[in-house]
């Protein structure tokens, strides 16, 4: 992973726009993920096969968990802005009202109903700490972290009740156990389906 520093607060209030411009102009290899994490443009390599498989398996199950009547989509490459922390995240999965994408403007992270990150060895701490903080600051109701690199024991952790930039742990299980997503999703997720890295 490489990082390009950018001043989060430039004179004249152009800080956020300048950071976003640097991100947009970053010439990253195909398949890489270019994000802004706390004012730093970060380029992550393409995810592994196991990483992609995990995201797809969850993606498939989330469709059945979306309440009827909700016009929500499940997205894999949607950029979510969080200028409050100088961040623009591209989560592995997010559930967002479709109307938020149709305005022609960027989507604020706080509009997401659920955000999912699947850790990679190279950037697990971003997912565990910086992104968790950013999503909590934005007010994302639920953050699901699928962490195959957690101290030798793959773990799925559901965070919720964001307050003052932090989440409360609602549930945490080792891969192989079931994890329940509460309303509005009402999904019992068998984490044994996820591949181990």
Can you describe what each PLM-predicted range is?
Residues 1-138, 142-197:
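Gly/Pro/Ser/Thr-rich low-complexity, intrinsically disordered segments predominantly at protein N-termini
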């Amino acid at each position: 992973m490489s990082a390009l520093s950018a001043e989060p607060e430039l004179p004249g209030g152009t800080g956020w726009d300048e950071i976003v411009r640097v991100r947009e102009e970053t010439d990253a290899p195909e398949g890489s993920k270019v994000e802004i994490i706390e004012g730093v443009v970060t380029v992550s390599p393409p995810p592994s096969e196991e990483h992609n498989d995990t995201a797809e398996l969850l993606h498939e199950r989330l469709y059945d968990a979306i309440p009827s009547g909700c016009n929500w989509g499940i997205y894999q490459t949607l950029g979510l802005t969080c200028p409050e922390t100088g961040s623009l995240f591209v989560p592995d999965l997010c559930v967002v009202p479709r109307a938020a994408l149709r305005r022609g403007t960027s989507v604020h992270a706080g509009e997401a109903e659920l955000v999912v990150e699947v850790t990679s060895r190279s950037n697990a701490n971003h997912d565990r700490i910086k992104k968790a903080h950013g999503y909590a600051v934005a007010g994302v109701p639920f953050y699901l972290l699928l962490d195959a690199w957690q101290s030798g024991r793959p773990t799925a952790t559901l965070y919720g009740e964001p307050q003052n930039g932090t989440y409360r742990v609602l549930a945490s299980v080792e891969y192989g156990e079931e994890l329940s997503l509460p309303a509005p999703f009402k999904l019992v997720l068998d984490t044994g389906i996820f591949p181990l890295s």
